[in-house]
Amino acid sequence: VQELLGGKFGEMSTFMNYTYQSFNFRNRQGARPFYDLLASIAAEEFGHIELVSAAINTMLTGAADGTPGESGSLADVKGTRNTQQFIAGGASALVQDSMGKPWSGDYVNATGDLIGDLTHNFFLETGARNNKLKVYEMVEHPAARALTGYLLVRGGVHQVAYARALENLTGADMMKLFPSPRIPTDKIPECQPHIKRGEHLKLYRFSQDDFKELAAVFNGPHPETGEPLTVAEEIHPEGAPAFDLPAQPAVFAPGPEPQEIEEIAAKLREGAGLPKEPTGVVAQNANGNSNGHADADDVMETVKDAIS
């Protein structure tokens, strides 16, 4: 799953490619529909980075349980492919690929040539979806399979979006010229909840007032199903606070004595005149509440259900 985060065709690459293409876009007003397309998809990719990281963190939760200094606390992970996740990463996601190679800015293609960049994006999504299917076939963890099912659907929308943009600019039907990868999402169980909600047909604007010209590019029939492509009325997909992963003392995350940090935080809140309980919600436990912690099995099942 790390490959889907920090690999050449991972979510870091899609996010940073589209982000810098939108940052560097010249004559934005004159070419608004295409700028709106890049900026909107870049915003969604930012969320995908968080989503992949959440899946990785869920998979690693419990893998390094134990007490520092006690024999065997990390014995079960010493033979893993990437021990850096436990030594340097706190049993969590790293900005690396599946073999520990760091993600690189060299993966970003932002030439300023709109047709060239859109063509690059089309094939970037092609490679990304290809890798997602391979990872799906390699994993059994339910959160990982739920993740890949979702990303296969949303990545397909982005691939179609870039194909439609190129067709509008050049007349070339990319989906007919390059019908790849052939991924039967209708036969993948983890894709079904998202397809039933129409997530394979719509793009989001991630803004109440901006990026409305996206509709000038993203329209017409879906090349595989014939259903109409639409810009969603809701500004973004429904989300939820991240899950409050339990402390992992063996890797000092968030420290060797997590309770001490909680006690210090409580005293600081009291000194600042804040309520006894933390204000707002930045995380929820496996039961969907904002208080308490969950064990590894609870986190795994709840993240799987939430992604689905």
Where in the sequence are the language-model features?
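Non-heme di-metal
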Residues: 1-288, 292-307
